[in-house]
Amino acid sequence: MNANMMQQPLLISTLLTHAERHHGDQEIVSRRVEGDLHRQTYSDLAQRARRMANALAANGVCFGDRVATLAWNGYRHMELYYAVSGSGAVLHTLNPRLHPDQVVWTVSYTHLTLPTTSRV
């Protein structure tokens, strides 16, 4: 007997798949670091996250690897959030407000496979 409450595993990628399927044309609006507004739909987000996941795989990122992001909260970081976790890697977010020495220590301590950044 299957005692699970859901018919599918509760994965981060499942959240985005659901949003794309049921709310694909719904607009996501965020403010960029530069100050202007960025608009995209859930379908756009899902497509960009899949492309990024493929790029991560092409760069040697495998299931269970650790990938760090050093980025402000925004649409680029959200795309990385879904791409990294959707590819089966572990996302480690680094705070851009940390002192550079703290970032270096964190990166060396976590044994990252691939650090990624947006313009910080």
Description of each model-found segment:
Residues 7-29, 47:
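A short N-terminal helical cap/helix-turn-helix that marks the beginning
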Residues 28-82, 99-104:
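Conserved AMP-binding/adenylate-forming core of the ANL superfamily
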Residues 88:
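Structured binding elements
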